[in-house]
């Protein structure tokens, strides 16, 4: 992550309101990494899926993150994936999607209204991929740098017509089969909780406990709402590594696991029109993916997907002036850019071309050969 932060000394930060163009100067980096494209796994069933979501991560955010580190020839960890596609992301009644509707599309495979979580536009229950996979003996984990009740993680376990009902969403997480959830949101979990039913941890050092594997469920709450970086909560990298380790060990005698890990605050930086904030969050996101790649290389049975719900901020990159790029924000809201998807591992070939965001759900199940999975209970 330091390599991103060291390159931001020339940033000129200013604030804006919607409709005002904001320019920021970003130094072109020199830490070039021209790693070879990762091998493509064809016609092989995936055992596990790790889905990375860069909230608010449009193509311009990816481009700026790359250029700020190593210039035109640099590649981010996921840009070496052998398969890429384009994802269209409108919601049920709007060209403009929010995170709730987009996450419902991946989690349940159906378009819904903005603000709805895994219920359709008529407020009818939609089974999610963790719920479907749990009947086959799979375990699921969620990681976020927001509250674990925020729209993206919540869509994988909550069924409700308002993403703002955090206390009820928190209850739904406790009632769910999610094996491990790490992020913020402690202010929403005021209900009595039995440590025997779900092990609660409130500081990052607890993630290093050797006995986490002894618990059937773990809930890590490292901030009242989103993670406040000034208070040094665990990084997305650390939370992702610990979630992967936990799920890998817990499913040693089970069919597999599903993990969603979100770089939530990439979006918040876009709303703030703050390049320095965005690149810092992006660095943690990219580091998390790099760690998952190392796991997948050894495991040989894990599909890694990297995508976004939408782009935020209307970020436009203008021609360099000397060694600086001009980064221009055009809105403090989401924009209508289509977003990319990157795939590596068994089943990656299913994610090429142009697809609707609901198709990600179907293709993930296809990669796992879901129709031929037998009913199972993961006993560990």
Say what each PLM segment does.
Residues 18-211, 216, 283-286, 311-380:
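N-terminal catalytic scaffold of extracellular/periplasmic and nuclease hydrolases
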Residues 2-7:
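Sec-dependent signal peptide recognition
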Residues 51, 220-222, 258-262, 305:
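Structural motif
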Residues 109-113, 216-229, 267-273, 342-346:
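Gly-rich Lys/Arg/Thr-decorated short loops/hinges at beta-loop-alpha junctions or inter-strand turns
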Residues 269, 273-320:
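Extended C-terminal subregions enriched in glycine
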Residues 204-207, 233-251:
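A Trp-anchored, charged/polar loop motif used as the substrate-binding/catalytic surface
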Residues 151-157, 224-227, 243-244, 248-288:
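Active-site His/acidic residue clusters
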Residues 14-15:
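C-terminal motif of bacterial Sec signal peptides marking the signal peptidase cleavage site
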